[in-house]
UniProtKB/Swiss-Prot annotation:
A Gene Ontology molecular function term of the record: acireductone dioxygenase [iron(II)-requiring] activity
UniProt source species: Caenorhabditis elegans
Subcellular location(s) of the protein: Cytoplasm; Nucleus
Protein origin, superkingdom: Eukaryota
Gene Ontology CC annotations of this record: cytoplasm; nucleus
Keywords, sorted A to Z: Cytoplasm, Nucleus
Function description: Probable inactive acireductone dioxygenase.
GO process terms (BP): L-methionine salvage from methylthioadenosine; methionine metabolic process
Protein name: Probable inactive acireductone dioxygenase 2
Main location: cytoplasm
Family: Belongs to the acireductone dioxygenase (ARD) family.
Length: 158
């Protein structure tokens, strides 16, 4: 089951740690959608036909024309620490984007309408859709490895 929570307001230290509020404030996928517009699905990766249909539907409904595989691994990624720091910088892009985790684990942080950060723990089979113009950031977990499929609108969307 997906884990989503409101982050502490001023996280310090390693971004790859959970950074829960105390006590933790869990959030449901429905609340995530209402607060940030971000959509979440857990895909059945064992049923290849259903998976292909779901991804085809996603690409058609959201006009995703490009996709790639992105791997971030402490053992093979050059300048891993610099890359983690770069990816954890807040960013906002003028187009929606989707990410599906195919190996490893990661955190996606999305800013809600009140300026609070919501953290999504993403693992194998998780698919998230981040709306256009939504502030977000990304990092691995302490396992330091994630492999994902990234879906884009067109060539200029990376």
């Amino acid at each position: 089951m997906v884990q989503i929570w409101q982050m502490e307001p001023y996280p310090c230290g390693d971004p790859r740690l959970p950074h829960h509020l105390f006590p933790p404030k869990k959030i449901t996928p429905d609340e995530l959608s209402k607060r940030t517009g971000t959509l979440y699905w857990k895909l059945d990766t064992l049923d290849q036909v259903a998976l292909a249909k779901r991804l085809t539907t996603l690409k058609l409904e959201h006009s995703f024309k490009k996709e790639d595989i992105f791997t971030l691994d402490a053992e093979t990624t050059a300048n891993f620490d610099d890359k983690i720091e770069e990816l954890f910088e807040e960013s906002s892009v003028p187009f929606e984007q989707a990410r599906m985790i195919i190996e490893g684990t990661a955190y996606y942080d999305v800013e809600d309408k009140n300026g609070q950060w919501v953290r999504i723990f993403c693992e194998y089979g998780d698919l998230i859709l981040i709306p256009a113009n939504t502030c977000f950031r990304f990092t691995t977990t302490p396992h330091n490895f994630v492999k994902m499929r990234r879906f884009y609108k067109d060539e200029d969307s990376e």
